[in-house]
Amino acid sequence: RHGLLIIEDNAQAIGATEHGRATGALGDAAAFSFYPTKNIGALGDAGAVTTSDSSLASAVRALANYGSDRRYHNIYEGFNCRMDEMQAAMLRVKLRHMEEECLIRENTAHVYSSTICHKAVITPTVSPGMRHVWHQYVVRVKDRDSFRRYLQEQGVPTDVHYAVPPHM
């Protein structure tokens, strides 16, 4: 209606599905992060954009190549965001094990959810028809800092991923 594109942030959801449809295939394009801490991590910074729109693909490819659509011809103010061969080779190997890794995280999350039985701890839920790939297992509590101290005393590491939301 307004000519807007839907671009999915699929940085932490590779392997997730909504009613059988893979995340990353729901919009006009999707951005994937392969930072080492992600579900499928490269050796260093890496990422990808997927789309079935050939003109959008050409624009993204040019932006990632200094804004150039061909050698020494810049059509945009771009960046150097090309993935090198070592990152691609590592990801190619890891991709073969993605489903196995997703199942391990799903099983671990199930163990957490079925054994954390305290009224002060709200565990995550998954809606019917959804497949969660558990990049993180996040719980909600009233006093985060006290809870983190308690877990630390029990030898359980925790982290606050975004102490200040990125948009703030």
Protein language model features and the residues they cover:
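Glycine-rich phosphate-binding loop of ATP-grasp-fold ATP-dependent ligases
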Residues: 39, 43-48
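Catalytic PLP-binding core of fold-type I/II PLP enzymes
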Residues: 1-20, 53
